[in-house]
UniProtKB/Swiss-Prot annotation:
Stored SUPFAM superfamilies: P-loop containing nucleoside triphosphate hydrolases
UniProt KW Hydrolase keyword: yes
Protein name: Probable ATP-dependent RNA helicase DDX49
The enzyme's E.C. designation: 3.6.4.13
Residues annotated to bind ATP: 46-53
Protein's organism: Mus musculus (Mouse)
Length: 480
């Protein structure tokens, strides 16, 4: 197998890789690094934990060493935590260069960030929203000379969903030069990325991992069928089991909402499990602190929303538990990708209720693998059921007393104001839209009822026997 030197990296970068314990390039690095060094645009799609970040960091650092200036490279990423992680890779691998980087994410002081940008760092790592804000409000820097534009977790950046980056990306793309190298990396190849691949006119290099399954082989994936009302008791039982069986067991539990995340964290702490939470309702400093405590093993359990499902590289994670079955298979792939990284073993357990069977089937179809059922002692779960339900209710009451929902609403309003929207006007629009949808639904129901009545009437008419025609008088006399 070719080494880092054989695929075109300079000796100083090969030495940096050796010091970090990177002995051989991974398949995605073998495929993409030579193409990037040749100056080609690149679209790389590989499993989580396969070394995608180093696949673009290494060639960018080599090109930067040949002609160092700022701003040389812009990296866009969907989450703040991932931005800091990418910056860490640039710093470690680019240490001999005296690399200057700048992280532009929400939740931090904009004035301090603007000052950093004005100093022309070599590499800017940013979330689209905050960088677009700077481009709209500041003229102390420009990006007209950047050589590389990187989109990490490109599927998330380009897909239109609950967080739509389209407007911000348009602002950013208008600010960068047309002549540049564009690198897109993702763990899931979505329809949007396929479309981009087909529309590209400059023949970009495309690399996709050839695998029969979409998750790594070292990952033991199972599901646990549980009734909705006793899900939390099964969760507590699972956590206790893993803590007993595995020494220094490190667990990430994924939930679907900030509120559930906070409640579960409070609940597990009541059961004396060392737990921290990570969700978008937390201040940025609190999020950093939670991640740092989990990474350093001060706390062994991290309960998180999908803000932690992408890109975060915490090699020691042994178990991922999905408290809810993900609604999209690609979310499942990113979640379970937080364990079994870089060749290590890992386990992923998904709690599936009676309402989630179709979601489980969709996941199995996407990853081209059937999940094995995990069997637990139901009697042991029933023993703690009442206690878990009581503790959960106590935590809910405590959270309600802290006005958690009100804070969430205030945060939403703040975000709207930052985006230049009127919160009251937006609420009015939503109410009007809901009213129109309701009217449309009623109209469709009436049309449906009318069509069904007409159909039923025509069926009755068709089912009646034809009436015999009365004989003409002349014919009747002739017969007599």
């Amino acid at each position: 197998m070719a080494g880092f030197a054989e695929i075109g990296l300079s000796s100083w970068l090969v030495e940096q890789c050796r010091q970090l314990g990177l002995k051989q390039p991974t398949p995605v690095q073998l495929g993409c690094i030579p193409a990037i060094l040749e100056g080609r645009d690149c679209l790389g799609c590989a499993k989580t934990g396969s070394g995608k970040t180093a696949a673009f960091v290494l060639p960018i650092l080599q090109k930067l060493s040949e002609d160092p200036y700022g701003i040389f490279c812009l990296v866009l990423t969907p989450t703040r935590e991932l931005a800091y992680q990418i910056a860490e890779q640039f710093r470690v691998l680019g240490k001999p260069l005296g690399l200057k980087d700048c992280i532009i994410v929400g939740g931090m002081d904009m004035v301090a960030q603007a000052l950093e940008l004005s100093r022309k760092p070599h590499v800017v790592i940013a979330t689209p929203g905050r960088l677009a804000d700077h481009l709209r409000s500041s003229n102390t820097f420009n990006m007209k000379k950047i050589q590389f534009l990187v989109m990490d977790e490109a599927d998330r950046l380009l897909e239109q969903g609950c967080t739509d980056f389209t407007t911000d990306l348009e602002t950013i793309l208008a600010a960068v030069p047309a002549r540049r190298q564009t690198l897109l990396f993702s763990a899931t190849l979505t329809d949007t990325l396929k479309e981009l691949q087909g529309l590209a006119t400059n023949e970009p290099f495309f690399w996709e991992a050839q695998a029969t399954v979409r998750t790594v082989e070292q990952l033991d994936q199972r599901y646990l069928l549980v009734p909705e009302k006793v899900k939390d008791a099964y969760l507590v039982h699972l956590v206790q089991t893993f803590q007993d069986q595995l020494e220094d067991c490190s667990i990430i539990i994924f939930t679907n909402t900030c509120k559930t995340c906070q409640i579960l964290c409070m609940m597990l702490r009541k059961f004396n499990f060392p737990t921290v939470a990570l969700h978008s309702m937390m201040k940025q400093k609190e999020r950093f602190a939670a991640l740092a405590k989990f990474k350093s093993s001060i706390y062994r359990i991290l309960i998180a929303t999908d803000v932690a499902s992408r890109g975060l590289d915490i090699p020691t994670v042994q178990v991922v538990i999905n408290h809810n079955t993900p609604g999209l298979p690609k979310i499942y792939i990113h979640r379970v990708g937080r364990t079994a990284r870089a060749g290590r073993q890992g386990q992923a357990i998904t709690l599936v209720t009676q309402y989630d069977i179709h979601l489980l089937h969709a996941i199995e179809e996407q990853i081209k693998q059937q999940l094995a059922e995990l069997v637990v002692e139901e009697a042991e779960v029933l023993q703690i059921l009442t206690q878990v339900n009581v503790v959960r209710r106590e935590c809910e009451i405590k959270l309600e007393a802290s006005h958690f929902d009100e804070k969430k609403e205030i945060n939403k309003r703040k975000q709207m104001i930052l985006e230049g929207k009127d919160p009251d006007l937006e609420a009015k629009r939503k109410a009007e839209l809901a009213k129109i949808k309701q009217q449309n639904r009623r109209f469709k129901e009436k049309v449906g009822q009318t069509l069904r009545r007409q159909k039923a009437g025509s069926t009755v008419r068709r089912s009646r026997p034809p009436r015999s025609r009365p004989q003409e008088p002349a014919q009747a006399e002739a017969q007599d």
